[in-house]
Amino acid sequence: MRTATVIAATLVLGTIVAAQQPLFKRTVVQQADLSTPGREVIQAVGEFQPGGTPGRHTHAGEEVGYILEGTLSVEQGDKPAVIFKAGQGFVIPAGQIHNATNTGTGVAKILATYIVEKGKPLATPAK
């Protein structure tokens, strides 16, 4: 009986921890002014749980992405989605509505470099 209780408690706690984990998380690792007035560079690591996505959005500048781990389906505007795997990269033009979704079964990670207008939000949800 005690073993069954411990197993049940472990399952419940595991479910709670999994439920609290966000499906997408962006962590800024570096930010600096550029020599071009009004522009800055921001580097961030995006972590996507399976099925995770930031949702359709834009940036006030270019995004250069490099897949560190996993598989992402990237949509740009009305174009068909393109699948990118670890070791591949892509460029998103300034103001382009886009989205990325982890289509794999494990965590996907991306290193994203943004060359953006200083003082503007890094990402703006698409309308």
Predicted regions and their residues:
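Short acidic-glycine-tyrosine-enriched beta hairpin
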Residues: 48-49, 72, 78-95
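Short, conserved beta-strand element in jelly-roll/cupin
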Residues: 47-48, 59-74
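Structural recognition of the beta-strand scaffold that forms the well-ordered cores
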Residues: 56, 65-66, 75, 91-92, ...
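Histidine-centered catalytic micro-motifs
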Residues: 55-61, 96
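A short, N-terminal "cap"/entry segment at the start of jelly-roll beta-barrel domains
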Residues: 2-45, 83, 91, 107, ...
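Extracellular/periplasmic catalytic domains that process cell-envelope and extracellular macromolecules
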Residues: 36-38, 58, 66, 103-107
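Ligand-binding loop in jelly-roll beta-barrel domains
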Residues: 95-119
